[in-house]
Amino acid sequence: MSSQLADPTYQGDLGNGLIRRWSTAADQPKIGQCLATVFRPNADAPLNVRSIDEVRILMSGAHPFMGPGDFAIVEDTNLPERPVVACTCCWSHTWSYAGIPFGVGQPELVATLPEYRNRGLVRALFEMAHARSAAKGEMMQVITGIPYFYRQFGYEYAIDLEGHRTVAAADAPARKEDEPEPYSLRLATVADIPHLQALYNQERDKSLLWHELDDGYWRAHITSWDDPAIQGKDVTQIGMIGPLRMIVDKDGAVCGYIWLATKRWGSALRVFALQLYPHVNWQQAMPSLLRACRAHGEQTPGIRAESKPFSEISFGLGRSHPAYTVLGEKLAPRGEPPYAWYVRVADVPGFVRHIAPVLEDRLAASIATGHTGELAIDLYRGGLRLQFEQGKLAAAEPWRQPDYGDDPPAGCPPLVFLQLLLGYRSLAELRATFPDVYAEPEAALLLDILFPKQMSMMAWMSYT
């Protein structure tokens, strides 16, 4: 048994008969029971069987983001069945910043049984998750989650997440009777992986941050629907949200892909991804795709008996998308702005050093090309010192305000700085919002060059 938080054999005593440890395959039923109990509408509702199936998928050994030993759990040893009373799982990804790859850890499925809440169990589990992520060399942790909660663990909202435009299903344009449908959908196969990679990565250069997906991800996404464990089951009871579909023309040539849900959480059919090759005309394709989505939605069941009837198509494609432009205000008058990813970067100087080539390229392309000088940024609980020599980053290191002397030329709350670092907000936007963000003119010029506002398109990519 190890005392190291990241070690698979670690076990820690939390008092009152509670221990924290890493999962094994044998824990799957108890983890599923915990999540199925927590993720339901109310205490009297049936267990959420989709959560049980999701745990089966995640712990199968075939999931691209994690394995059976990647749940951090708390179990109650006072009870004979030693139930799992709190848990989170730890996914691992490769993202990139302007093309520079780095590791990312993602805690997900964070849950505590109601009777065990307010005991610090999630904090204890996040200590384990952060330790394991650090042991893997991951420079960043991210999470999608409920408002505010994860700020207490060092996370800040710093990347767009989703964003929706909604079309009334009845408004899908009718096809002329004498014209064949120009585009149709078919299920993706492993033979489509080169197309999926090419279509997905079309947007890579437009996004500051990017989720680097290998062929194994697409293969798992596709073949998971062939699993004997789900054959013949009600789709509302399984943990996966929907298979990938290829968009093909009248001749069967691949023109794009779309990711549609196989169940509804309300009246809307959700569209998680949509991409077309550059040679395909979006204006010509969208009417056909709307009709295909409407037909699919009419066959898509709600997850509850009381679910509202299908009436809408919700395109969750981010802040902007070619489909939104084509739909316009007439077809998609109602939208929802993006939520955001929570982001944690424990070693900001280390991350800055990692992306130094990008910063140097930005300097070289600016009016400050060949810059030599120091920039100290007060982060209030510490700071960051950047030293440039002839346009090259010579140092990025922790800095602390001395007891006496002038204030540094720039200051920013420590977590808010992540919004600047990751291009989520400009310096001017942060200064207009936070009174404790400041920069003297020369420092402001340099910060604007080094950390410009830039869009990141980071979609939810798990198929569960």
Annotated model-derived regions:
Residues 71-73, 81-93, 104-106, 111, ...:
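Conserved beta-strand in the GNAT
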Residues 135-139, 144-164, 316-337:
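Conserved active-site alpha-helix within GNAT-family acetyltransferase domains
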Residues 43, 54-72, 87-89, 99, ...:
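N-terminal, Lys/Arg-enriched amphipathic/low-complexity engagement segments
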Residues 109-112, 118-131, 281-295:
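Conserved acetyl-CoA-binding loop-helix of GNAT-fold acetyltransferases
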Residues 157-181:
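Flexible glycine-/small-residue-enriched beta->alpha junction loops
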Residues 1-29, 33-46, 53-56, 75, ...:
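Intrinsically disordered, low-complexity, positively biased terminal segments
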Residues 133, 141, 150, 245, ...:
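Conserved catalytic-core segments centered on acid/base and nucleophilic motifs
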